Regions:
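Structural detector of well-ordered beta-strand residues that form the stable sheet scaffold
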Residues: 32, 57, 78, 131-132, ...
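Hydrophobic/aromatic ligand-binding patch that stacks against planar heteroaromatic rings
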Residues: 68-70, 123, 147, 164, ...
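Conserved active-site segment immediately N-terminal to the catalytic lysine
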Residues: 133-168, 183, 207-212
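Phosphate-binding glycine-rich loop
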Residues: 7-55, 69-73, 79-81, 146
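PLP-dependent aminotransferase class I/II
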Residues: 13-20, 28-29, 92, 104-108, ...
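Short beta-strand-to-turn element immediately C-terminal to the catalytic PLP-Schiff-base lysine
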Residues: 157-158, 172-177
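PLP-dependent aminotransferase-like
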Residues: 46-135, 142
Length: 369
């Protein structure tokens, strides 16, 4: 690829082929390859016309980009609480914070578990709202037979280094079934070029006038696209292994009385980006809490974490703004104080997963009253 000197979107073919393959894989009509997952959210909001005076509802249990993209669009992030099992926003928590200024919803499918999308889409239709699916942690997840990223108006994907699949450290994608929206996003990511002017219009000899609006350069490189195409072929095997690893940890955790293991609905395929279980604090011995459990697990050589930021609005970036909710979001805070997160990536060996399970049970036996 490098020796060919065809290394950007306009000199090579890999980017365009990756877009076609990813659209087919995600069950959508269109896909656009981008430089990272954050600009996937940016281009979605811009194309939907979200801006000054608008409010966008989003979860607080997420990475900052889900909220900062709203701020950068000139809109106001409004944080909704989450479901205790999926850790995702729901139609009920969304409706609780809706106002006449609400323009859109960003649904983050946290850790590979999809939001309950039917009620959310029904609510959005009733109130003429746009829905962006943040699929950064959910490659391969599905809801009632539909791949995530194919249900809302736009799916925004990340291929960052630690995601389920990567394009060499950074990368992103947007997916949609709306052709007009696809053309608008395609134009925005490439200096305002018009798809019709580039591909579907006859031009007189001489200079070709292609830029019919204003945009910027958010294109993916050909090297990124080549890596993405290869990784996409490995997704079925990787997803099977990820889920098997998560199920082993869930089974071990299920034998610990002081742990709560959420049950994934039968109509949902979990992408198993990470594996979460939750501490029942009322069943712990005195002197034990989630953080001590994490420390004891780590001391025995097993990586374990508290998980995703539970109240992203507590970041310093929100100081001096009106974006923080008047009261802490109760469920999000509870999850943030009780969650245990484990790695389940497909390169982990059976011995490593077995050790994770054994250490988890050993530590919980010490911690449980």
């Amino acid at each position: 690829m490098v020796l060919s000197n065809k290394v950007n979107y306009w000199t090579g073919q890999a980017g365009r082929e990756f877009e076609k393959e990813f659209a087919a894989w995600s069950g959508t009509a269109h896909a656009i390859a981008l430089m990272n997952g954050t600009v996937a959210l940016d281009v979605a909001l811009l194309a939907l016309g979200v801006g000054q005076g608008d409010e966008v509802i989003v979860t607080s249990r997420t990475f900052l980009a889900s909220a900062s993209s709203i701020v950068n669009a000139g809109a106001v992030p409004v944080f909704a609480d989450v479901d205790a099992d999926s850790q995702n926003i729901t139609a009920e928590t969304i409706q609780a914070v809706m106002t006449p200024r609400t323009r859109a919803i960003i649904c983050v499918h946290l850790a590979g578990w999809s939001c309950d999308m039917d009620p959310i889409m029904q609510l959005a239709e009733q109130h003429d709202l746009f829905v962006i699916e943040d699929c950064a942690q959910a490659h391969g997840a599905s809801y009632k037979g539909k791949p995530v990223g194919s249900i809302g108006h736009v799916g925004a994907w990340s291929f960052c280094q630690d995601k389920i699949m990567t394009t060499g450290g950074e990368g992103g994608m947007v997916t949609t079934n709306d052709t007009a929206l696809w053309k608008k996003m395609w134009s925005l990511k490439d200096h305002g070029k018009s798809w019709d002017a580039v591909y579907e219009r006859e031009h007189a000899p001489g200079f070709r006038w292609l830029h019919e609006s204003f945009g910027t350069n958010w294109r993916m490189t050909e090297m990124q696209a080549v890596i993405g195409r290869i990784q996409l072929t490995r997704m079925p095997q990787w997803q099977t292994q990820r889920l098997a690893n998560a199920q082993a940890i869930w089974a071990a955790a299920g034998e610990c009385s002081a742990l709560r293991v959420p049950v994934v609905p039968a109509d949902t395929v979990h992408a198993a980006y990470k594996c979460y279980v939750f501490v029942k604090r009322e069943l712990l011995k005195e002197g034990w809490d989630r953080d001590r459990i994490l420390s004891e697990i780590a001391a025995r050589g097993v990586p374990s974490f508290s998980g995703s930021c539970s109240e992203v609005y507590l970041e310093k970036a929100f100081d001096g703004t009106d974006y923080r909710p008047a009261q802490p979001l109760a469920v999000a805070r509870e999850l943030g104080e009780t969650s245990l997160m484990f790695l389940v990536h497909p390169t982990l060996t059976t011995a490593e997963i077995d050790k994770t399970c054994a250490v988890l049970q050993e530590v919980m036996a010490l911690a449980t009253a």
